[in-house]
Amino acid sequence: MSKAKFERTKPHVNIGTIGHVDHGKTSLTAAITKVLGFQGKANYTSYENIDKAPEERERGITISTSHVEYETDNRHYAHVDCPGHADYVKNMITGAAQMDGAILVVSAADGPMPQTREHILLARQVGVPYIVVFLNKCDMVDDEELLELVEMEIRELLNTYEFPGDEIPIIRGSALAALESTATSVDAPEYQPILKLMEEVDKYIPTPQRDIDKPFAMPVEDVFTITGRGTVATGRVERGTLKMGDEVEIVGLSDSPKKTVVTGIEMFRKLLDQAVAGDNIGALLRGIQRNEVERGQVLAKPGSIKPHTYFEAQVYVLTKEEGGRHTPFFNNYRPQFYFRTTDVTGVVELPQGTEMVMPGDHITMKVKLITPVAMEEGLKFAIREGGRTVGAGNVSKIIE
């Protein structure tokens, strides 16, 4: 098959497969590329190629993830699949690949298992907004009643973690049957569940709002003064657009944001009328002294982000092999929390009944920072000690 050129005109959606080990996540990923490949909408990627995922380093953490891309009539998809359970936990917490939706794979022969539960919980905590279920290995179960029982169990589990379990589409099929089939026509019966799944993903997972359409935010990386013109803050626009004359707030590292107006935008030494998500810019700030803005603050559309000091987070603690701590930590542990462009010291509160946290653990904890940081739910951070990363986290709930 000739390499189909992916048209970038279609809306783009990031998805991934989640679920218990050996329930068929990687087989399903391969089957999707095979079946869509018949329609010229994907390049078939074999199970072996997905399974030997390359290791990537994200914020100093090694994660194995496989990325495949494919398209349907309506959309372009980037799809992540992780070989190991620890890779999923790390991937979902660090947001190496932020998912707009996930395909939960459950083996019909086994029903929901411990990691099924953990992945649903993680999806809830780190803000994966939509789940579609693929009930795999249905060819191994002859009993229709058993299939219905497993479906009920899955729906109950989803409801437990505040997903709309009763509305979520569940598609029955067999990824292996699709992979092993020698049929070259996309109309073969064993390929229908895969096509049905993609149809449901298209329908059920909404197209995400693009970064450029969100309210403006730019983490400040550096600040300098231009004699006669004023103070310039530089950084990469995280989201939204900024036009000359826009009012912005300087948020974080102080209790209340400071308002100012952007009187000039510069990129590569040229003046711009406007900057968009992804641009590296310098913003000239009216009436702001050199000491009133610093690295670690965020320029943002007024009212869109607030400074906070106390939050709950999902945290993955690095193992010794990953360069993390060699010993556990306890309540009142005081590391640095690295948000966007700066470190702030914080105090850790462990959940009741948790004596200590070991390297390699995934834990929910509360953190009290000594200085406010521009923060919203879903924000990623690293935990550092003396400049080295010892953990990664995701703000799951702001307390104050």
From Swiss-Prot:
<dbReference type="InterPro" id="IPR041709">
    <property type="entry name" value="EF-Tu_GTP-bd"/>
</dbReference>
<keyword id="KW-0378">Hydrolase</keyword>
<dbReference type="InterPro" id="IPR033720">
    <property type="entry name" value="EFTU_2"/>
</dbReference>
<dbReference type="Pfam" id="PF03143">
    <property type="entry name" value="GTP_EFTU_D3"/>
</dbReference>
<feature type="region of interest" description="G3">
    <location>
        <begin position="81"/>
        <end position="84"/>
    </location>
</feature>
<feature type="region of interest" description="G5">
    <location>
        <begin position="174"/>
        <end position="176"/>
    </location>
</feature>
<keyword id="KW-0963">Cytoplasm</keyword>
<feature type="region of interest" description="G4">
    <location>
        <begin position="136"/>
        <end position="139"/>
    </location>
</feature>
<dbReference type="GO" id="GO:0005525">
    <property type="term" value="F:GTP binding"/>
</dbReference>
<dbReference type="Pfam" id="PF03144">
    <property type="entry name" value="GTP_EFTU_D2"/>
</dbReference>
<keyword id="KW-0479">Metal-binding</keyword>
<dbReference type="InterPro" id="IPR000795">
    <property type="entry name" value="T_Tr_GTP-bd_dom"/>
</dbReference>
<comment type="subunit">
    <text>Monomer.</text>
</comment>
<dbReference type="InterPro" id="IPR005225">
    <property type="entry name" value="Small_GTP-bd"/>
</dbReference>
<dbReference type="InterPro" id="IPR031157">
    <property type="entry name" value="G_TR_CS"/>
</dbReference>
<keyword id="KW-0648">Protein biosynthesis</keyword>
<dbReference type="InterPro" id="IPR009001">
    <property type="entry name" value="Transl_elong_EF1A/Init_IF2_C"/>
</dbReference>
<dbReference type="InterPro" id="IPR004160">
    <property type="entry name" value="Transl_elong_EFTu/EF1A_C"/>
</dbReference>
<feature type="region of interest" description="G2">
    <location>
        <begin position="60"/>
        <end position="64"/>
    </location>
</feature>
<feature type="domain" description="tr-type G">
    <location>
        <begin position="10"/>
        <end position="209"/>
    </location>
</feature>
<dbReference type="GO" id="GO:0003746">
    <property type="term" value="F:translation elongation factor activity"/>
</dbReference>
<comment type="similarity">
    <text>Belongs to the TRAFAC class translation factor GTPase superfamily. Classic translation factor GTPase family. EF-Tu/EF-1A subfamily.</text>
</comment>
<dbReference type="Pfam" id="PF00009">
    <property type="entry name" value="GTP_EFTU"/>
</dbReference>
<dbReference type="InterPro" id="IPR004161">
    <property type="entry name" value="EFTu-like_2"/>
</dbReference>
<feature type="binding site">
    <location>
        <begin position="19"/>
        <end position="26"/>
    </location>
    <ligand>
        <name>GTP</name>
    </ligand>
</feature>
<keyword id="KW-0460">Magnesium</keyword>
<feature type="binding site">
    <location>
        <begin position="81"/>
        <end position="85"/>
    </location>
    <ligand>
        <name>GTP</name>
    </ligand>
</feature>
<feature type="binding site">
    <location>
        <position position="26"/>
    </location>
    <ligand>
        <name>Mg(2+)</name>
    </ligand>
</feature>
<keyword id="KW-0342">GTP-binding</keyword>
<feature type="binding site">
    <location>
        <begin position="136"/>
        <end position="139"/>
    </location>
    <ligand>
        <name>GTP</name>
    </ligand>
</feature>
<dbReference type="GO" id="GO:0003924">
    <property type="term" value="F:GTPase activity"/>
</dbReference>
<keyword id="KW-0547">Nucleotide-binding</keyword>
<dbReference type="GO" id="GO:0005829">
    <property type="term" value="C:cytosol"/>
</dbReference>
<dbReference type="InterPro" id="IPR027417">
    <property type="entry name" value="P-loop_NTPase"/>
</dbReference>
<protein>
    <recommendedName>
        <fullName>Elongation factor Tu</fullName>
        <ecNumber>3.6.5.3</ecNumber>
    </recommendedName>
</protein>
<keyword id="KW-0251">Elongation factor</keyword>
<comment type="function">
    <text>GTP hydrolase that promotes the GTP-dependent binding of aminoacyl-tRNA to the A-site of ribosomes during protein biosynthesis.</text>
</comment>
<feature type="region of interest" description="G1">
    <location>
        <begin position="19"/>
        <end position="26"/>
    </location>
</feature>
<dbReference type="InterPro" id="IPR050055">
    <property type="entry name" value="EF-Tu_GTPase"/>
</dbReference>
<dbReference type="InterPro" id="IPR004541">
    <property type="entry name" value="Transl_elong_EFTu/EF1A_bac/org"/>
</dbReference>
<dbReference type="InterPro" id="IPR009000">
    <property type="entry name" value="Transl_B-barrel_sf"/>
</dbReference>
